[in-house]
Amino acid sequence: MFPTLVTLAAAATVGGTFLPWLRSGKHDRTSYQLLSLLDSLGFASAGPVGWAVRLWPLLPLVCAIAAVASWRGMWPVSSLAGAGAGAYALGLAMVVRGASTTSFIYDRWGVTFTLVSALVLTAASLAQAGDGMRRFVDDDADPERPAPTPESTRR
């Protein structure tokens, strides 16, 4: 169950980053175009905001790591990558959605799609971590229980 949910949420989050996030004038802008513009204009030159803007293109890679690790039964890696990517996308989408709008600049539906899918990715990753920890503790409680195989960890 968790590999499917994490994969779908990660794919939706990555897909949402390519949807229109902002409309400026007559043009829709994706998250990548928006952050490239912020960087070019010097609004995100230093500090945590600068790092957040520059590391944004790595989000699809981290989402792919979360999905692949989940299918491989590596729930700690998957949960960490999924929760990190989900929280990162969720935070940035909330900032863009909460920004003041003008008659020339306003947010589009892609930012809401990304916000929702990132929330699902974060929740699925945290639930996967909780399930993995529960199974880990249960395995330690019964010393006679055989070691799990990669196939048995997929649910």
Where are the model-predicted features located?
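Compact integral membrane and secretory-pathway proteins
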Residues: 1-155
